[in-house]
């Protein structure tokens, strides 16, 4: 997708062990729903998010109790930790000192210049970035009065205002988000922001709703934005278990070929030719590949006549027939299997291919590490 090349023009920003922006992959982020001061509950939820494929996690820091818990949380998780700060610069300083990987603030809301400068200097000293988070629902009064209501222009001007505060202090290690619950507004804001800034953009449709409707709304909004090559990190915001946010985000990225470390399932919608219980098989396989973290495409198809040819791009697949199934790789049949065991045989093939790809990835990573040394 040539439009995706836009992302290579953004300035790379390090967040923990990840490089965000530049020509790097789009990163999946989520946010905990626990009380941050409850370390056990927060770590447990983050571990679940990690397992689902979350790559960066954000926690709220509304008070001293939350700030006091950050170091312990950070020491017990494996992905970069981002902390959400509003208004109180002392909480930001404490979060930075605790070793978090990024903070999310709006400098204009922190207070006097010396307070902002203290936060910026602390972030510089630790080498961590700051995310400026503009939200249509909390746009500053000056921009609401100028435009009459939340607009893309007002949102980008708000971001420019906060960016200037940081740049005037010599700080450029910045990520920007411009979230709205209205898909068209978000699309317009991110499109304008991509033309205005060279900083990485964190994209999302905020307050998108419960699981079903929110997933569709997020997919529509994120899909439109990502199709323009805009976005270095993504979050799906749902009124549900945050693990579901990660699942939806992975599926959106996979749809655009932007998920380097995720398995994809393709399956047919069924018709009168079907001789197997394809729907239940597809659900079982989808669940099985959920936590496979390599780029593998799996097909589950109901028609043995057309199935293999229709899914020739799949790494591995199965096509059902009466009392049997055909296992195929890249459209070529490798063997017939009895219907009773075809799902288990498919899983074995999936595991073998995943192991091959994982080993190949590890070799490539080792070669890169050797070159850098």
From Swiss-Prot:
Q: Where on this chain does [4Fe-4S] cluster bind?
A: 268, 271, 303, 310
- Enzyme category, top tier: oxidoreductase
Which pathway does UniProt place it in?
Isoprenoid biosynthesis; isopentenyl diphosphate biosynthesis via DXP pathway; isopentenyl diphosphate from 1-deoxy-D-xylulose 5-phosphate: step 5/6
Reported EC number(s) for this entry are: 1.17.7.3
Q: Name the coenzymes or cofactors required.
A: [4Fe-4S] cluster
One Pfam family per UniProt: GcpE
Q: Which UniProt keywords apply?
A: 4Fe-4S, Iron, Iron-sulfur, Isoprene biosynthesis, Metal-binding, Oxidoreductase
GO biological process per UniProt:
isopentenyl diphosphate biosynthetic process, methylerythritol 4-phosphate pathway; terpenoid biosynthetic process
Q: How is the cofactor bound?
A: Binds 1 [4Fe-4S] cluster.
Gene Ontology molecular function: 4 iron, 4 sulfur cluster binding; 4-hydroxy-3-methylbut-2-en-1-yl diphosphate synthase activity (ferredoxin); 4-hydroxy-3-methylbut-2-enyl-diphosphate synthase activity (flavodoxin); iron ion binding
Keyword Iron-sulfur part of the UniProt annotation: yes
- Reactions catalysed, as given in the entry: (2E)-4-hydroxy-3-methylbut-2-enyl diphosphate + oxidized [flavodoxin] + H2O + 2 H(+) = 2-C-methyl-D-erythritol 2,4-cyclic diphosphate + reduced [flavodoxin]
Is Transcription one of the keywords? Answer: no
* Protein task: Converts 2C-methyl-D-erythritol 2,4-cyclodiphosphate (ME-2,4cPP) into 1-hydroxy-2-methyl-2-(E)-butenyl 4-diphosphate.
Q: Which family does it belong to?
A: Belongs to the IspG family.
Q: What is this protein called?
A: 4-hydroxy-3-methylbut-2-en-1-yl diphosphate synthase (flavodoxin)
Q: Please give the organism.
A: Exiguobacterium sp. (strain ATCC BAA-1283 / AT1b)
Gene coding for it: ispG
